[in-house]
Amino acid sequence: MKHIVIFLALLSTSCNLFQRQQQAGESVVEEKQQQEEVFVPVEKELYVINPTTMRYTVPDIHREPKDRLNSFGHLLEIEAESEHFYKIKSNWNWYLRKEDMGSYEDIQFTKEVLEDVHFIGKREGDTFVDEKEGTTLSKYFTIDLISYEAYQKAKKNGYFPLVKDTLAIKKKEGILSLPCNDTVVKLKDVEMTPQDDLEVYEYEGEMQPIHQYLIAGYYYEAGDKFFIDKRTGHETEIESHPYLSPNGKYIITLGVTEMGGATAIALYKVLNKDPFAIELVVSAWIRYWVAYEASKNRPTFFGKDGCLYVAMDALDSYEYNYKEEDKPCKYVRIKIK
C-alpha cells in the first residue's frame, strides 16, 4: 500500500511538471509569434480593398481583431509594415492585415459585394416595406463588373432620351413655367424665411419618348426629382434621377440615399404612356458602391442591349475622387431580370 501511495504521488508530480512545461512552451511559442511582427518604417498610401476588413489594436494574427473597419475603398497612409500587418498613420495604434490593403486596381468587387444592400423593398405611402431577410439586388438585376473599354464601346451606341431645351424653358423672376397641352405648370422658388421653407426648382430636361419634363426640387436639407406630363401637367414622383430603357418598358433611378452615402436604386415598370403611369417594382440602398450619376464625362446610360451602364466606385473612393474626373473609377453593367 505504501508503495502505491508513493507511486501516485510521483505520478501527480510528473503530470504537474509536464503541464507547467507545456504551458511554458506554449507561452514561448506565443511570445515568439508576437515577436515575429517586426515593423519597418515606410511612407506610402494604400486602399482598403476588402469590404470586410478587420481592425487590430495588437499586431498578432493569432488574436481576435478589435472590430470591423467599414472603410471599403478608403485611401490610408501607412507608416510601418511587418510580415503580416500595416501600421496605419494615426493618433491611435491600429493595424490592418496586408491582404486587406492594395492598389486601386486591387479593390475587390465580387458579385456578392455588387449586389449587397442596406435595405430592399418598396414604399407604400410613407412606409418602407422590406423584402425578406437576405434578399439582395440579384432578385431583380444581374450586375457585372466590366472594363473601361466595354463601357466606352457601349457608350458609342448609348441611349440618351433626356433632352434639355434651355431656349424654350427658362426661369423668370423665380418662376419656372412649363407649357403643357392642357395648361401651363408654374413652379415658384421660395426663399427661406422664419415663415417659409426653402424651395428651388430647376428644369433638367424633357424625356421625349414618354412626354415628360424632368424637374429637380431643392429644399432645406432635402431634394427630389419628379416628372411633369407635357400633355396634362400631371406630376409623377420618382426616387431620383431616371434612366428610361430603350424599349420604354422600364425606368431605373440612381441617386444618393436620404441619409447620404452609397447609391439608392429603384426600378419602375411603365404601365402606360398615355395617360402616363408607372409602378415601383423595388427600391434599395446599395451597401458598398456609389454611382457617378451626375458626371458629364462618365454618364450613366442604357446601351442598345437593354443594360444600364454605370461608372461607380467604392463609397470611400468616390468621396476622394468625385471632383476629379481624370481619376480612375470602376464600371458595372446592370441587366433587368
Regions found by a protein language model. Give the residues of each.
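Bacterial Sec-dependent N-terminal signal peptides
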Residues: 1-28
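Boundary regions of SH3-family modules and the immediately adjacent low-complexity/disordered segments
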Residues: 23-41, 89-136
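Beta-loop motif signature
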Residues: 25-85, 120-123, 180-186, 190
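Terminal domain-start segments
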Residues: 108-217
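Surface-exposed loop/turn elements that mediate protein-protein interactions on large endomembrane-trafficking
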Residues: 174-193, 220-237, 266-285, 323-337
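Blade-terminus and WD-like Trp-Asp/Gly-His loop motifs, strongest in beta-propeller folds
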Residues: 204-209, 241-253, 299-308
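Beta-strand C-termini and the immediately following turn/loop, strongest in propeller blades
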Residues: 215-220, 253-259, 264, 310-316
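Conserved blade-ending motifs and adjacent loop-strand segments that build the rim/top face
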Residues: 280-297
